[in-house]
């Protein structure tokens, strides 16, 4: 069934970007011969009560793949005693919204709503996380998605943040979870048009065509 409403179109685009990223990660894991299980086991490593970078990387990758259920499982198994309760509740809400499907955005015909107080509480921590001596950009990425902060910009510290698809995924994620998602989607579309091709500095014209198509 072809999505017709702006919200359904945005959800379908999010589902596509999530599946695409899942394929990218699967290829990387196959090439490096590193199992996801071994990576998850690394999540249990802590230092001075602070969760390891591996933990936040896996939670970020799972949310980026649209798998909030698995992200919630990782949080419960490895970090429940060390994570801000607001973060736990937000991930749990996303997992509940996903239900039994493989992708949070798969067949979604409703607007996912998250507690505004929890989102604001997480948002208040984003800037302080960035100002730490060695900020964990995966944690910043998770907090940014959950709180609905402005879309992630490219980062030299996290390879996954460099792709235009990551920008669009986070931008659409934010747009569909506000009180007036249609207005937010229109604003995002207008922003892409205003920025123009020069903002998306890739040699191919596809670097601008992709955000243009994804937000129309």
PLM-predicted stretches and their roles:
Residues 5-8, 12, 82-85, 117, ...:
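Alpha-helix boundary/N-cap detector
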Residues 56, 131-216:
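Extended alpha-helical solenoid scaffold regions that build the rod-like backbones
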Residues 13-20, 24, 39, 86, ...:
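Charge-rich, solvent-exposed alpha-helical interaction surfaces
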Residues 1-38:
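Intrinsically disordered, low-complexity acidic/proline-rich regions
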Residues 14-17, 33, 37, 106-124, ...:
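Alpha-helical repeat scaffolds
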Residues 21, 25, 29, 66, ...:
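Helix-turn/linker elements and helix-coil junctions of extended alpha-helical scaffolds
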Residues 39-97, 208-216:
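Extended amphipathic alpha-helical scaffold segments
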Residues 92-137, 141-145:
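Eukaryote-biased recognition of long, low-complexity, charge-rich segments
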């Amino acid at each position: 069934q072809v999505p017709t409403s702006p919200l359904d179109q945005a959800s379908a685009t999010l589902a596509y970007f999530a599946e695409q990223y899942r394929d990218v990660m699967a290829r990387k894991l196959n090439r490096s011969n590193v199992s996801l299980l071994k990576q998850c086991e690394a999540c249990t490593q802590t230092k001075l009560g602070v969760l390891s970078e591996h933990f936040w990387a896996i939670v970020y990758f799972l949310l980026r793949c649209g798998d909030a259920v698995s992200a919630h499982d990782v949080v419960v198994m490895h970090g429940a005693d060390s994570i801000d309760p607001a973060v736990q509740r937000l991930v749990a809400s996303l997992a509940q919204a996903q239900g039994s499907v493989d992708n949070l955005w798969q067949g979604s015909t409703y607007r996912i709503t998250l507690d505004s107080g929890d989102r604001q509480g997480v948002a208040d921590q984003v800037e302080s996380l960035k100002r730490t001596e060695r900020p964990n950009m995966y944690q910043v990425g998770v907090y940014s998605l959950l709180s609905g902060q402005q879309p992630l910009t490219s980062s030299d510290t996290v390879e996954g943040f460099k792709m235009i698809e990551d920008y669009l995924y986070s931008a659409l994620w934010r747009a569909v979870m506000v009180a007036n998602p249609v207005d937010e989607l229109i604003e995002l579309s207008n922003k892409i048009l205003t920025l123009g091709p020069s903002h998306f500095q890739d040699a191919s014209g596809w670097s601008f065509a992709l955000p243009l198509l994804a937000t129309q």
